[in-house]
From Swiss-Prot:
Location, primary (coarse class): cytoplasm
Keyword Hydrolase on entry: no
Annotated ranges, domain BTB: 212-279
One biological process term in Gene Ontology: actin cytoskeleton organization
Name of this protein: Kelch-like protein 1
InterPro entries: BACK, BTB/POZ_dom, Kelch-typ_b-propeller, Kelch_1, SKP1/BTB/POZ_sf
Lineage: superkingdom: Eukaryota
Cell compartment(s), UniProt: Cytoplasm, Cytoskeleton
Kelch repeats: 460-506, 507-553, 555-600, 601-647, 649-700, 701-747
Organism: Homo sapiens
Ranges of compositional bias, category Low complexity: 72-88
Length: 748
């Protein structure tokens, strides 16, 4: 018997079996399913011919070669053996079985070479496929190998066992002159579920504790396993078992710093690929996976924890992810904490934070709070939770509170507070904040990290309407500094171009403009919270290209064009009476004018007067109801963007001549006006020319939004830092806009 348990037949036994079973007459010539036939040779005896033998005989007869399938004579039977590469008839069940045989022939005088064979496991057979029989000899003139095809094995059961494919190569005609080693019939088999079946077998060995070659000891628990399986999924075990360390040869390995149940779960995962994730065990499992270097398990555990994030646990998950080196999980948990800080500070985890972790929260610009007062009260709540031990950390933590941005009433109360009056460092911080409020003209000299507002406290930047590729944008976008993203916030009631926008009580007031056919005097109010529009009383004058701003409560509509002429008139809207009234007119008619409020005065900058662009600037004093001329800008500008920052007025971009003038240029110049000295100074230019650019202050930086560069309506935005005198590219709008009105709402 062979090692596989199947019976091996010698050549004589095969011949006797064939002769006994097939030596009977058959009336038919044989078909694909009808078995073989008996043919009479020249000596008058009969022998059986199967379909494959018949084809082989005909092929050899065409070549003038006597077939070796004919019954050999007694003189040659002892020195010959049959050989084939065909489908052999199985007398046990009447099916044709593929037999692949590599015929090998040595050089003359070297004797007969043993045939190479490929065996297939066929589930319906009880005996191994009978190999082909080789009759090498000088009487063989040639042999045609049967063409074999790819046959899927459809005999597999529902379990998947025995699934696979047989791949057979095409045979070639071989003659005595050909090299029999170079022409062969080969078959290739690939089991579809081989790896799965193998690991199932290994799992059964694990359950029965068979062939285990290592025992992992953790605590009082011993876990048997197979080194090969563990090292195939874990880089930790692979390094241990393949390196020159003592554990590589030890049968028992002690594991430290790992939960026994988590280790057992991961050992089972190595065999099965299955893992159960539970909220109460996920941290132990993730810690073990990080130690054993199982990146796939680490990833799924991290995603599971991301789904569990809540204001009551996000601080703990963030700290745990940081300790385990799970960078992505830590980032997600940190972002969640920053976004939901208002709910986080109400939970027990916040009160239990160590001082080192708390200071990271207090120092962050990204905490989503409405004002600095919220962060200050959170610190005081944390200190009072364990006042005796935490008072020593108070001065260190108070330095991360932006005290200059607190209301002066709170600062006055802190000076004599029991927690602060005996702490010298706290007193210094409080005094610094008071100076910031008492000396506003010196604030530019007092800039520090404590005077920089947090991103969430500066409000939201809105871009309304403007000219786009569709001849007029009707969408409203808003920009969140904390996330650095633009999203659509609403829609206008209709198309408006060259209009103005002001903000009162966190509402947008859209004033004047033109709709493409006529100049408008209409006014509408948009509430971002309810996303509703309200119609307000119209202006007395139709205006497009006007400037709009808020000065000490009322809205001012300055200059513009009424469809016939350039205007120098100015109207003021009182939010209490909801009426428009005229105030003093400007010295010069101005359209596409830039306006801004600074130090209780209304400034009107540049613009066009009908013949040229203007460099002049004048300001309006509401207390005297008069306009006064100021020092002119260095450049003439129409379509200029204007905003104020730290007591200075900035003029940004624009054009220096009407578009009809072939010498017209679009500008990237930026100028700064100091009202104390009545002088203009050139500062860092924009990264590109921007005409009809929208400019406003957000936090401690100026933002230049959209515009026109001569070819494209721009969707880009850049911010200017007065401290570094540099422009920085920021997130882009969703669409390009020129002449968009940009404003900031503190509480969107």
């Amino acid at each position: 018997m062979s090692g596989s348990g199947r019976k091996d037949f010698d050549v004589k036994h095969i011949l006797r079996l064939r002769w006994k079973l097939f030596s009977h007459p058959s009336p038919s010539t044989g078909g694909p399913a009808g078995g073989g036939c008996l043919q009479q040779d020249g000596s008058g005896s009969f022998e059986h011919w199967g379909p494959s033998q018949s084809r082989l005989l005909k092929s050899q007869e065409r070549s003038g070669v006597s077939t070796f399938w004919k019954k050999p004579s007694s003189s040659s039977s002892s020195s010959s053996s049959p050989s084939s590469s065909s489908s052999s008839f199985n007398p046990l069940n009447g099916t044709l079985l593929p037999v692949a045989t590599r015929l090998q022939q040595g050089a003359p005088g070297q004797g007969t070479q043993q045939p190479a064979r490929t065996l297939f496991y066929v589930e319906s057979l009880e005996e191994e496929v009978v190999p082909g029989m080789d009759f090498p000899g000088p009487h063989e003139k040639g042999l045609v190998l049967q063409e074999l095809k790819v046959e899927p094995d459809n005999s597999s059961q529902a379990t998947g066992e025995g699934c696979g494919h047989r791949l057979s190569s095409t045979g070639h005609s071989m003659t005595p002159q050909s090299d029999l080693d170079s022409s062969s019939s080969e078959e290739f088999y690939q089991a579809v579920h081989h790896a799965e079946q193998t690991f199932r077998k290994m799992e059964s060995y694990l359950k029965q504790q068979q062939l285990c070659d290592v025992i992992l000891i953790v605590g009082n628990r011993k876990i048997p396993a197979h080194r090969l399986v563990l090292s195939s999924v874990s880089d930790y075990f692979a390094a241990m078992f393949t390196s020159d360390v003592c554990e590589a040869k030890q049968e028992e390995i002690k594991m430290e710093g790992i939960d026994p149940n988590a280790l057992w779960d991961l050992v089972q995962f190595a065999y099965t690929g299955c893992l159960e994730l539970k909220e109460d065990t996920i941290e132990n499992l993730l810690a073990a996976a990080c130690l054993l270097q199982l990146p796939q398990v680490v990833e799924v555990c991290c995603h599971f924890l991301m789904k569990l994030l809540h204001p009551s646990n996000c601080l703990g998950i963030r700290a745990f992810a940081d300790a385990q080196g799970c960078i992505e999980l830590m980032k997600v948990a940190h972002s969640y904490t920053m976004e939901n800080i208002m709910e986080v500070i109400r939970n027990q985890e916040f009160l239990l934070l160590p001082a080192e972790e708390l200071h990271k929260l207090l120092a962050s610009d990204d905490v989503n709070v409405p004002d600095e007062e919220t962060i200050f009260h959170a610190l005081m709540m944390w200190v009072k939770y364990d006042m005796q031990s935490r008072c020593n950390d108070l001065s260190m933590l108070l330095a991360f509170i932006r005290l200059p941005l607190l209301p002066p009433q709170i600062l006055a109360d802190l000076e004599n507070h029991a927690l602060f009056k005996n702490d010298l460092e706290c007193q210094k911080l409080i005094l610094e904040a008071m100076k910031y409020h008492l000396l506003p003209e010196r604030r530019t000299l007092m800039q520090s990290p404590r005077t920089k507002p947090r991103k969430s406290t500066v409000g939201t930047l809105y871009a309304v309407g403007g000219m786009d590729n569709n001849k007029g944008a009707t969408t409203i976008e808003k920009y969140d500094l904390r996330t650095n993203l633009w999203i659509q916030a609403g829609m206008m009631n209709g198309r408006r171009l060259q209009f103005g926008v002001a903000v009162i009580d966190d509402k947008l007031f859209v004033i004047g403009g033109r709709d493409g056919l006529k100049t408008l005097n209409t006014v509408e109010c948009y509430n971002p919270k309810t996303k509703t529009w309200t119609v307000l009383p119209p202006m007395s004058t139709h205006r497009h290209g006007l400037g709009v701003t808020v000065l000490e409560g009322p809205i001012y509509a300055v200059g513009g064009h009424d469809g016939w002429s350039y205007l120098n008139t100015v109207e003021r809207w009182d939010p209490q009476s909801q009426q428009w009234t005229f105030v003093a007119s400007m010295s010069i008619a101005r359209s596409t004018v830039g306006v801004a409020a600074l130090n209780g005065k209304l400034y009107s900058v540049g613009g066009r007067d009908g013949s040229s662009c203007l460099s002049s600037m004048e300001y309006y004093d509401p207390h005297t109801n008069k306009w006064n001329m100021c020092a002119p800008m260095c450049k003439r500008r129409g379509g200029v963007g204007v905003a104020t920052c730290d007591g200075f007025l900035y003029a940004v971009g624009g054009h220096d001549a009407p578009a009809s003038n072939h010498c017209s240029r679009l500008l990237d110049y930026v100028e700064r006006y100091d009202p104390k000295t009545d002088t203009w100074t050139m500062v860092a230019p924009l990264s590109m020319p921007r005409d009809a650019v929208g400019v406003c202050l957000l936090g401690d930086r100026l933002y230049a939004v959209g515009g026109y560069d001569g070819q494209t309506y721009l969707n880009t935005m850049e911010s200017y830092d007065p401290q570094t005198n540099e422009w920085t590219q920021m997130a882009s709008l969703n669409i390009g806009r020129a002449g968009a009105c940009v404003v900031v709402i503190k509480q969107p």
